[in-house]
Amino acid sequence: MEPVADRELQAKLYLERHRIMELLNQLTSFLLFARPKKPREYLISLLERLRVAKATHVAFPYFMDNSNTVSMFEMMDMAGRGCISFVQYKEALKNLGLCTADEVLNDDGHIITLDTFRDEMNKRMEKMWSMF
């Protein structure tokens, strides 16, 4: 019989290889964002949409539509200037699970507009979902 430590290591490697924890974190983030009345059906729907997108090589579905993105941006842009700070931008990406804690994002001094925010979110979402 295998030692417990060996089985634990095998389990850990399996989860890492298949990126299961990242997938669960993303699904949880979207579940908490949407707060559907039927969470199980919602999660099944998300996974099915991802499976179809991957199998048919079509674009991955965006789980936050434009109105959600605009609302999030407007909450951060409380002064209505049409831009947010780099710190706000980075925190939003972290909160959505689109930026890892150890990822280094460099502030290039440019302002973050709604278009920049939306484009970067969509790019990161597509990249993230394509890994699963």
Curated annotation (Swiss-Prot):
GO molecular function term, any single one: calcium ion binding
Keyword Cytoplasm: no
Keyword terms, alphabetized: Repeat
SUPFAM superfamilies in UniProt: Dimerization-anchoring domain of cAMP-dependent PK regulatory subunit (SSF47391), EF-hand (SSF47473)
Keyword Repeat among UniProt keywords: yes
EF-hand domain: residues covered: 64-99, 120-132
Protein name: EF-hand calcium-binding domain-containing protein 10
